[in-house]
From Swiss-Prot:
<dbReference type="InterPro" id="IPR038584">
    <property type="entry name" value="Ribosomal_bL33_sf"/>
</dbReference>
<dbReference type="InterPro" id="IPR001705">
    <property type="entry name" value="Ribosomal_bL33"/>
</dbReference>
<dbReference type="GO" id="GO:0022625">
    <property type="term" value="C:cytosolic large ribosomal subunit"/>
</dbReference>
<keyword id="KW-0689">Ribosomal protein</keyword>
<protein>
    <recommendedName>
        <fullName>Large ribosomal subunit protein bL33</fullName>
    </recommendedName>
</protein>
<dbReference type="Pfam" id="PF00471">
    <property type="entry name" value="Ribosomal_L33"/>
</dbReference>
<dbReference type="InterPro" id="IPR018264">
    <property type="entry name" value="Ribosomal_bL33_CS"/>
</dbReference>
<comment type="similarity">
    <text>Belongs to the bacterial ribosomal protein bL33 family.</text>
</comment>
<dbReference type="GO" id="GO:0003735">
    <property type="term" value="F:structural constituent of ribosome"/>
</dbReference>
<dbReference type="InterPro" id="IPR011332">
    <property type="entry name" value="Ribosomal_zn-bd"/>
</dbReference>
<keyword id="KW-0687">Ribonucleoprotein</keyword>
<dbReference type="GO" id="GO:0006412">
    <property type="term" value="P:translation"/>
</dbReference>
């Protein structure tokens, strides 16, 4: 069986609230760290979420 190309990643809020999203990305085509602007319900606004490894 072939090795999967998608890996699970954790998107941590930059607002410091501790809120995170879990998503997946193709590690072969997207080699740089992912930064997305998403909604943080704890801060109640849209903030940047940066990629981190799932522990």
């Amino acid at each position: 069986m072939a090795k999967p190309t998608t890996i699970k990643i954790r998107l941590n809020s930059t607002a410091g609230t501790g809120y995170f999203y879990v998503t997946k990305k193709n590690a072969r085509t997207m080699t740089e760290k992912l930064v997305l602007k998403k909604y943080d319900p704890v801060a109640r606004k849209h903030v940047d979420f940066k990629e981190a490894k799932i522990k």
